[in-house]
Amino acid sequence: MSRGLGDVYKRQKDTLYVNLFIPSRLTWKDKKITLVQETRFPDEEQIRFRVEKSKKKAFSLKLRYPSWAKGASVSVNGKVQETNAQPGEYLTIHRKWKAGDEITLNMPMQVALEQIPDRENFYAFMYGPIVLASPTGTENMDGLYADDSRGGHIAHGKQIPLQEVPALIGTPDSIRNSIHKNNGDRL
């Protein structure tokens, strides 16, 4: 198993942490509980959890609240839960969980521009946690692919003059506000 997949869930005494949003099933033997995570993240902003088995045990469920997900909310069985968590923290719900409980985490995603370090007018386009890219053609690609050889991270192909590179003109806010995800589009 990939090292990262072992970090989807972490248990600590009476607390279950959810760190990654991946369709999965967790059986917590000590608590006699099974939790199922259903998601199409990042194509959908909603992550659903379902308690399949439970002996009505109390514990805290901590859902990671990513820094990009401003305005995230969580509900249990359709009722929105109050939380004081900020982006970059965990949304915490403490209760006695029972079979059939449904938890829904909504994490709104929007287009954001992240300035490239040391480059005043260069930005990366983000949609939630995803860095966006655009196909720009496949001709004249010799020497532009990286590989794992010594120095393979350096492109050895023809350099394209900056004035020939496609550019977007406007302020970061005006450019960001002009980009939208069409309903039904996949990332």
Regions found by a protein language model. Give the residues of each.
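C-terminal beta-strand-rich structural cap/linker in extracellular carbohydrate-active enzymes
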Residues: 59-62, 93-108
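Beta-strand-rich binding/interaction modules
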Residues: 56-76
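Glycine/proline-rich low-complexity spacer/linker segments in large multi-domain proteins
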Residues: 107-185
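Edge strands and adjacent loops of beta-rich recognition modules
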Residues: 10-53, 62
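Solvent-exposed beta-strand/loop surfaces of large extracellular or lumenal domains
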Residues: 69-94, 113-120
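Single conserved hydrophobic/aromatic residue that forms the stacking wall/gate
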Residues: 1-9
